[in-house]
Curated annotation (Swiss-Prot):
It is found in: Nucleus. Residues 45-58, 305-318, 334-345, 488-509, 599-617 have a biased composition (Low complexity). Residues 1-79, 223-274, 300-451, 463-617 are annotated as: Disordered. Belongs to the EFG1/PHD1/stuA family. Residues 106-212 form the HTH APSES-type domain. This is Cell pattern formation-associated protein STUA. It comes from Colletotrichum gloeosporioides (Anthracnose fungus). Disruption phenotype: Impairs conidiation and ability of their appressoria to form a penetration peg, leading to unability to infect unwounded Granny Smith apples or onion. It comes from the Eukaryota. Residues 569-593 are annotated as: Nuclear localization domain. Transcription factor that regulates asexual reproduction. Binds the StuA-response elements (StRE) with the consensus sequence 5'-(A/T)CGCG(T/A)N(A/C)-3' at the promoters of target genes. Required for the formation of aerial hyphae, efficient conidiation, and the formation of perithecia. Essential for the generation of normal turgor pressure within the appressorium. Required for infection of intact apple fruit and penetration of onion epidermal cells. Keywords: Conidiation, DNA-binding, Nucleus, Sporulation, Transcription, Transcription regulation.
Amino acid sequence: MNQPAADMYYSQHMSAGQAPPPQTVTSGAMSYHSQHPPLQPTHMPQYAPQPQYSQYGYANGLTSPQSAQPASQMGQNVLPLPGVATQGFQGFDTTGQVAPPGMKPRVTATLWEDEGSLCFQVEARGICVARREDNHMINGTKLLNVAGMTRGRRDGILKSEKVRHVVKIGPMHLKGVWIPFERALDFANKEKITELLYPLFVHNIGALLYHPTNQTRTNQVMAAAERRKQEQNQMRGAPQTGAPGLPSIQQHHHHMSLPGPQQSLPSHAQMGRPSLDRAHTFPTPPTSASSVMGGNMNASDSGFQWAQGQGMGSAQGANPMSIDTGLSNARSMPATPASTPPGTTIQNMQSYQSGAQQYDNSRPMYNPSAQQSPYQATNPASQDRPVYGQPDPYAKNDMGPPTTRPATSGAPQDQKPANGIIHADQSGGQPAGDEEAEHDHDAEYTHDSGAYDASRASYNYSAPAVGNLPAEHQHLSPEMTGSPSHPPASGRATPRTAAAPQPYYSQQAGYNTPPRVPQQPSSNLYNVMSNDRGTAAGAGTGDVYQPQADMGSMSNGYASQMNGAGGIKRGRDEDDDLQRPSSGGGMDLKRRKTLLDSQVPAMAYAPPVMAQQPRRR
């Protein structure tokens, strides 16, 4: 390993599958400590009578080709019994080299990206003890944990180590105090856990990975590790190369891992890894599988294919895609081969936020200010954020609420519907007409819109009234629908893009809660079904007044009354409620307590006397 001599010696032993005898340790010591080798000849004869250990040759764990020659060279006497070895060498137990009877070497290897080294891992007693490939240091903390040592004693021992490397960040099994190989072997021998940890101390532990029956898998692992190293170096060298950088890396992976012509996706699928890593970006739209990996990963290419995959005109597709590859570089994903390629997944991810494209709501995310430009690599967080629908810092800042609406931009107390009605984004029960009118005003701001602020109307409802919504793919990003350039499909502008209030806001400038469309019967019925007011006293829900939100839809500001049965009690209600006709919340709370006891269908005629009352007060 470190010295060619040691390499030669150990590789022979390893491959022979014989537990290297005590002298292996000495020779190991030779390689590390440069001790004298004379022990080898002296001890060899002692162990001659135990040839049966060659049965345990464990050639399975080691490179088979060499297995024949070392045995012949060294003779059978190289095979010590573990017990004898312990007696022969106090402090230098070679059981680390010898497989205990019946035990198969179980080694896994992972790439420790922070340190740039491959780590071999052996698990014992549920604890994973790691050893680095480059300098063979071993995680002493985990090693002593396997020994069952108390924390205080363990830390004391490790603090007194002269050569140690403390790791405080990273995966759990890699944190701890790393100590040199020889010291770790010492500790393991003292604590009698060397056999338990086999093959952690086998000098040529890498050979155990190259298991003959497992050769292809092992090669894949090692090749992947190599690829990652190279990739990391590339990415560090040119962190934000933009679109051109992607193809090179992408093709680099294809060529390294696969023989034969590298087509866009098929080869990618065979690689096996990208599918995994792509999953941890975000669900890509259904067609992304065939189109995300454009042939050469050119920005326009992949965009073009993606757009066609979505059934959109190529004219729209080719243009906006320039964003994608830049974006994927900009976001802070680990630069593993598979997480880089879905360059378009980022744009797919953004496309999620614009479900009902015709409202153009996600357009300002790209237009308004320099920091939001998706090309900018400095704020990957805010580029990823719209994807997940979290409240977007700039989405809120840039959209001024329409002038007629009270300043609700950040005020959930306004959003909370006056009567506690569950909105369509919560229950989905409201009729379509209601949804549109109501959500165009307040769904962006509703009290539960923490998850929706960034994506706004796109998630909150799918307005059935819009003609081309069914035809268009729900997940298209605003650029792809061309929303910046052509008028919104629905024919109306969003609050953020319109200078003047929308026509349907202007009539109701006086209301503090979002007005409703005149869809009274269904609205009333909805209250009956899902409002928490009606059930307090088994009361009917045909309230004297609709919640303030509903009043906008009625000509005179109150709902039609129920049939005369409730007349007297309702009169009292009005006296209480109407003192503050503008505060919807107060009305509802009182009304909830004092509703009628009879469940009656809504929509009866309103006595004229009642009708005058709101105006008197």
